[in-house]
Amino acid sequence: MRQNSDYPSLGPFFFAGKIKLSIATESFSAMKRSRAESASGPQQPSRRQPQTSCDLCRSRKIKCDRGTPCGNCRTRGLACSIMSPSSAPSPGASSAESAGHGRLDTAILARLAALEQAVFRSTSAVGGSGNAENGAHGDATPRVPLSGLEREGRQTANFLDKAYDRCSSASTRSGYRPLDIRVAESCRDSFATGAPDPVWLMPQKDAVAMVHDFVENIYHLMPIVHIGSTVSVIDNVYPALQAGNINHVDPAQVALILGICAACAFFWDGGVPCQHRFETEGEATSASLIWKTSALYAFEEAQRRGSRSLEGAQACAILAYLTYNMDGPSTRFYRLHTCSVTACRELGIHLVDSRGCESTDSTARRELKRRLWWHVAATDWMLGLNGGPLDGTYTVHPRQARVALPRNLNDSDLAIDSEILTMPPHVPTQASCFLQVIRLAEICRMVVDSQSPDDSIADTAYNERVLASDELFKKAIESMPPPLVLTSPIPEGAPRFLCLQRASLHLGFHSRRARLLRPFLLYKDSDGRQGTTYRRSRELCVRSAQTVLEISTSLLEHSLRIRSPEPFRRQILHHPGHHSCPASPIHRLGVVVNHLFCACAILAFECSLRKNSSVHPRQQHRGAGGEDDLDGMLVHAYRLLAAAGEECTVAADLVCAMRGVFAKYRVDGDLATVDGRGGQNQIVGSSRSAMASVQTSAGGACNEQQQIGPAAWPGMRGAIPDENQPMGEGSLETGKAWDGFDKDLDDLFVANDTYCSWDQIFARLGSYCGP
């Protein structure tokens, strides 16, 4: 029908109103249809009485004894639960419809969780480039709740697995005498016998005091002990022992108590505030060795009994760390570390944040499990970029674990029952440096994954791959929170040992960075295109080694109270409050002395290569940081390493190893006469003598490296100059210190100017660099 021209044209408002009226009419019709359908449908009767039978008995129409759990569920190994009325399905609903709704709800929850993860992504300091792809973090992908069928299947599988474990892990109780565990009347009596059998525990009040010292003086970067839970263990162990119920005492808990006390005694010093005090450092050393041996005996007893407990895993990790600091990276250390990883897996700690984990642990205990797992995992990954027998390998695969990152909290904050409570990265806590250690470990794992045993340093692609890995270290160092920067002042309320913790953290970063770039030191600038291509890698390696040398020597000077010579005075750690930081345990930390040793080896090798070449790249900087300065720093570091050997067996052995490596490659020269007068200096004192004597009395056979005095070190006589002799005044011929190293340097190379591998030149160096 045509519109009459006499009428005005219909405007847009007319059509808009017509559309709105049509929509309203359709909506009203749909509303009437829905009301009619709901009225004609069957009405669902409400439940008159509360449900008394469990879900399993009700679904299978069997009699329920209404126990908790009931007999039917207990027989089948299933969880006994009663479905709430709000979640109960209607009687008229079909199974297909309920399954479809379940899948729809699961999909919606997954999409919502993924959206929240994308929008509110965590910006914690540990979130590096490899966190989102490795799948190890519990928050890497959303946790979707298990459906009823999935939960029943997992419970059945767990029941069958536990039945198998009970049959296959029978303890060997026959043929051995149970370990005798007693409580001494005084702390001195617990180690005065000098033998670990019977195992003597210190009095209860002393054990509680040392637990507080272990947690509050966290110089060891091991926040895997919670004061409240550990004190509860002590309160259970001591009354049982005093009542004579030794069969009711778990030896793993005894091992944890002894391991904590042994660590406190090993790092004890009278100048550090603590709740438990020894009379002398020699007494603390004796107690540490006896308690450590007793803890190992108790841990072996727990293994014979087939004990599985969180305390056993904690004890194994602490004993591994203590063994590393006492003996270095020995075979026992590697076995204890592997045992700690296995203990965590047996307890399911690697799945503490998985979908199927239905643990009833408290918030503090769950957080403790996260810290323990990340400690053993980080140690495992760092050993992969560490040298020694485990170099280039790791056993903890990130996709086989589901554990969230630890939160940035102090030990006292764990008492708050909250899973979301955490401090910002710029707030220093007892876990701040530990989180950065995890980040370092993840970088080490990615570096190991990017390399192959068949890689050749002559390949340019390998150099590019190494530089890409080095960029990970660089970004991690540059993005550290302000309190963890070396030159930053210590904030108010920071942990007591934050200064030492962050210095050890930077040692780990720069030492492994230097180790990554170390193979390219074999090329010189005069080696044509390859020498020019690898120049940046060599410069970064030397710079990182110098940083390690400066940090470690500054720490040892502060700990040993040795004044640095004026020409080599460094400012890298001279921040406000540096000298007020506790320093006593530093020279007993194997991390510091090991990294110092490897930095000295790298710089000595680089210095010798430059001396042997016709071009000296640092000739223009001879006045500040030139070769003469580097020679003096190396000699001073050598002196500090030997001085630390008075109380640290690892440091004393590393001095022997350094001279052994030099002698093996015919670098024996004037190094044995660093002192211009050629005089001898007995560097080993009474503390090392006490340690060796205690090891002998405890049943440990002392090897050649554990003898006392300069006689134990044939090449050490005269190697250490007089402490009263000033350096840099012409009396100490620093130029002769490393002249023997570049003697016969051409013998280090094979024909056709093809360098032998770095591992052949420094065959023994890698095994002495600790995690």
From Swiss-Prot:
Q: Which GO terms describe its molecular function?
A: DNA binding; DNA-binding transcription factor activity, RNA polymerase II-specific; zinc ion binding
Q: Which residues bind DNA?
A: 54-80
UniProt keyword annotations, A-Z: DNA-binding, Metal-binding, Nucleus, Transcription, Transcription regulation, Virulence, Zinc
Biased amino acid composition, Low complexity: 42-51
Top-level taxon: Eukaryota
Induction remarks: Expression is induced by the presence of dimethylsulphoxide (DMSO) or by the deletion of OSM1, a HOG1-related mitogen-activated protein kinase. Expression is positively regulated by the secondary metabolism regulator LAE1. Infection by the totivirus induces the transcription of TAS2.
Subcellular location per the Swiss-Prot or TrEMBL entry: Nucleus
- Name the SMART domains on file: GAL4
GO CC term (a single one): nucleus
Describe the outcome of a gene knockout: Impairs the ability to produce TeA under the DMSO-added, TeA-inducing culture conditions.
Q: Where is this region: Disordered?
A: 33-53, 125-150
A GO biological process of this protein is: DNA-templated transcription
The name of this protein is: Transcription factor TAS2
